[in-house]
Amino acid sequence: VDLGFWPEKTEIESLLVGNYVHSYFETKEAHEAFLERNQDKIISQRGKTAGQVKASFKQADKMIAALEKEELFNRLYHGTDDEMVEKERIITGTLEGIPFKCKIDSLNLSGGYFIDLKTMESLQSEKYSTTLHRYTKSLLYNIVEYQYTLQMYVYQELLKQTYGYEFTPYIMAVSKEPVPDKELILIDDTIIEMGRDIFYGNIKALKDALAHKSVEGCGHCDYCLTNKSLTMAKTVAEFLQQ
C-alpha cells in the first residue's frame, strides 16, 4: 500500500502546491528540479496573466516564508549541524501481511522523531467532524477526517521495524490563507491509537483491495466521486437518514 494518491490525482493543482512547498524544504536542487519539471503548471498559459506565476503558487511562496522565519521549525525540520537528518526518506515494511511504502518528509535519526509537512486550507475555521460528532478546528478535522491518524501510526510502525526503536511523530501544518497560519503538532498516543484502530478495523478491506477483489467504497472521497455513476433518483428523506 502506497500511502499517497491514485495516479489520476497526482496533477491536481492543490497537490502541486503542496509538493512545491515540500520540495523547497527538501533541498535547493530538489526545488529547482520541481520548478523545471512543472513550469507549464506553475506559469499561467492563457489570458491576461499569461507568463505570470499562478496565484496558488504565489500563495505557496507566502507559506514558505511563514515557515522559513520560524526558528523552531527550522531547528526541528532541518536539524542541527551534528544531527543526522534525512529528507523525503522512503520506508517500506509489512504490517499484518500487508506491504506498505511511505515517504517521510523529515526524519531526524539523531533526535528520534519525524515530521510530516501538511498544507491545509485553514487551521482555525470550524468544520463538523463525523468521527468526533462535533464542530472542531480545521486542523483537528484534517488530522481525523483525512486519517492522518492512520498515516502516523503506519509511519511509526515501519520506522520501528527499520531501526528497532520508536520515533516521535510531529505534523507541521501551514495554511493557504492570505496570511498563512502555522502550528507544530506533537502526535501523542491518543492519535496513534486512533490510527491503530482504523488499521485493524480495515485489514480485510486492505487485503481485498490488494487481491483486486471488489470492495465497498466510502462514497464521498475524491476517488469514489471520480468513479460515481448515477443509477436512480434519491429522496430528501434518504439524505436526512444518512
Give, region by region, the residue ranges found by the protein language model.
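Metal-dependent nuclease catalytic cores that hydrolyze phosphodiester bonds in DNA/RNA
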Residues: 1-103, 220
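Secondary-structure boundary elements
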Residues: 77-79, 108-116, 159-167
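Conserved catalytic cores of phosphodiester-cleaving nucleases, focusing on short active-site segments
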Residues: 102-138, 155
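Short histidine-centered catalytic/ligand-binding loop motif
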Residues: 8-10, 49-52, 128-146, 188-190
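Coil-to-beta-strand transition motifs
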Residues: 97-101, 108-112, 166, 178-180
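A residue-level signal for conserved active-site and pocket-lining positions in enzyme catalytic cores
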Residues: 22, 106, 199
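Hydrophobic/aromatic-lined pockets within catalytic cores
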Residues: 25-29, 119-122, 160-163, 207
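Metal-dependent nuclease catalytic regions and adjoining charged, substrate-binding loops involved
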Residues: 142-149, 154-242
